[in-house]
Amino acid sequence: MKVLDSNALFQKITFFEEAHADPNPGRQLERIREAVPRFKEWFKATGKATAFHSYDLITLPYPKKYALWRAAWSPVAYIWFTNRMFIVQWEAEGRVWTLLNEPTEYELASNTPYFADQIRKYGQFLSHTLLSYRYQTVEQHLESVGLRPEDVDFITFDHLHTQDVRRWLGTTRPQPDISPDAPVKAYFPHAKLIVQRKEWDILPHLHPLQKIWYQPEKFEDILEDRLLFIDGDVLLGPGVALMWTPGHTQGNHSLVVNTDTGIWVSSENGVAAECYAPRESGIPGLRRYAEKTGFEVVLNANTIENTSRQYNSMVQEKLVADPCENHPRIPQFFPSSELRGHLFAPGTKPSHQHKRVAFGTIVRPGGKGTLAK
């Protein structure tokens, strides 16, 4: 397959290579703890992102047994969380670069086997009105801050669960469901999908534990020159990195951004910042769970592909993220799908929510700055 060489664009990060290579999960965790301080010192010295903003896409239900794995006491079946997109910009090589992190097209994501089954169970009306709430789309958010499709250089997702990027990147053949008469024309004419090679490689041969969360057939006709494979940890630009954090999936990675308040980390390994500090949580059960087990984190465990590896990745995220200014025991970890309170989910309201980040000014390449909204 003809794809771009990420090594020509991004800098390889090597601080965690010994930890990644260690097959012993306990020793691996020790190596992660040892590597984090050196990584943080180096990463902060690379500079800061020029813009880092979040945008709400959709609030929807999700099984509590996955979101707060084994920890929450509430008898409810579902929690509610808000899925968000992040716009990240940095300056390098005399220009501004723009990354969309988690630009989920939620209408197409609803065709994922798990969510399609839930919609059949509860019906279209309840699923799309009472049980979920749609904010603005990816396109609307970009328009609101003055960005055009051609301004986007890269898109990425922490992993490919639920994703369908055909409209974003274009296809080589007509698509019966969205473009039956002609190949799909890319909405983002220049954007490349940054994806871990390990994540991409599982798509043709999904395990039964994985199948209900992916739409592998939706990637078969993606234009080859739109794929940008990475292997492990990479620095995208000053103050912006992707950190390989497997476990939830084999190719999971986390967005790492240096800002005026320090380092932020984002992924879906955990659904709340307090899942990384459960002893500080007011959600019934989480503090007791942490005290009883000694666990430092509460996993988002819908696939349980590699539980100890996901645990280690979450500890890595927790240690890399700097503490919140207003609550030093809570890390600046911003879940890409963040837990929120809901009338139908008593006993699951988080004690702490980031809700929004807005650092710096989003600009058009070669244009004037526009304050993000």
PLM ranges: what are they?
Residues P149-D151, H190:
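Short acidic capping loops at alpha-helix termini that bridge into adjacent secondary structure
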Residues R84-A92, L100, E143-G146, P180-K185, ...:
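Short amphipathic alpha-helices and their capping/turn segments at secondary-structure boundaries
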Residues R166-D177:
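Metal-dependent catalytic neighborhoods of phosphoester/phosphodiester hydrolases
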Residues Y106, H161, E199-W200, P246, ...:
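Catalytic metal-binding/acid-base residues of hydrolase active sites
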